[in-house]
Amino acid sequence: HNQNLVEERLHFFSLKNRHLPVWCTEAYKINVIQNITKQINQSKITSTQKILLQNLVNNVYANAKALNAKSYADQIAITNYLLWQNLPNCADNAMVYLEMEQIASELIQKFHLHKPTIINQLIFSEVGQKLYAENYHGISGAFTNDPPHGSFLFWAIQNKMRLALILKDGYLVNEETNYKINLDPKIVSDKLKSRELIPTTALSLSIISFYYGLTCGGGFSQVDYLTSMKWAYLNCASELNNETDNLLIKNTITNYLVASFAFLYLNNNLASSIDWILYQKLEAIELLQQNLNQITLNQAFQTLLPEFYHIITGEFVDPKYIPNIIPILYLT
């Protein structure tokens, strides 16, 4: 936020690219950093804040490892890790963000192309495909036929845009573009390597959470659809007589909520992590630590209910109805 408390954004790419999948977005180069510097110089913040912001860009986004990364997704993993460490009192944080779809893609290629696992059967066998179609239909993150929504097992990438696929006669097809791919292990493997195919959210989570048993935390929507996916996967495993997978998944937790909490404000606006750097005050740092040690999870969560309301309905809550539940730290 600038001195007028108006949100300003630094754009790495043109806004026309906002709908492009991260999966196929190319890595940014040094010229992007140079453009960011120009945007910082034109922003309505103090000269001291411009220096702080430029230092952040240099330390995080102009980092040599980030600039040498092969893809934008790899850059995000590196820069988010570095961003956490550049926040006040957060130097010891080791938060790593990885691309779920890439993990699922590599696991398919290494372990599920030919071995008769439940994942192999769901993707490549006619019986498994039919079971997937019956059990995952209508689940958010999977697919719906009427009205058409989501994609069956994979998304296709053509001209840097996602294509939704349906199952038709053993092929994945997009009828609007005549795109067609045979669900053959060699073909699917090649398309995953070239990043022409992306595992859907449903397939990715089924592999990571259900087949391998990793606990996957997520937002308030995920705890709903991940639970639905678990029962869909269990039904498929039962029909395929895959008892080993069946036993493993029964202990998988699907309601692990991971949510943001609001602690910092600029006047009456929620402050971002970048604001925390630009408007940092020693007394605010001390008060934040005190707040984190004293407030309850319930109190912290309730501060974001208006934000959840906006996400779900598209409408904003009148500030007079927002309860002052926890002590608010003002950076200005």
Q: What are these model-predicted stretches?
A:
Residues F13, I30-S43:
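Active-site-facing alpha/beta catalytic cores
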Residues H1, E99-I103, F220-Q222:
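An acidic- and aromatic-residue-enriched active-site/binding cleft used to recognize and process polar
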Residues Q39-Y179, K191-S194, Y212, N267-L270, ...:
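Aromatic-residue-lined binding/catalytic grooves and analogous aromatic/hydrophobic interfacial grooves
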Residues T215-G218:
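Short hydrophobic beta-strand that contains or immediately precedes a catalytic carboxylate
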Residues S189-D190, E196-Y212:
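Short, hydrophobic/aliphatic alpha-helical segments
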Residues H1-I30, L192-S194, S206-I207, Q222-N293:
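Catalytic or ion-translocation cores adjacent to nucleophile or general acid/base/metal-coordination motifs
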Residues N182, K186:
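Extended active-site and interfacial segments that coordinate phosphate-rich ligands
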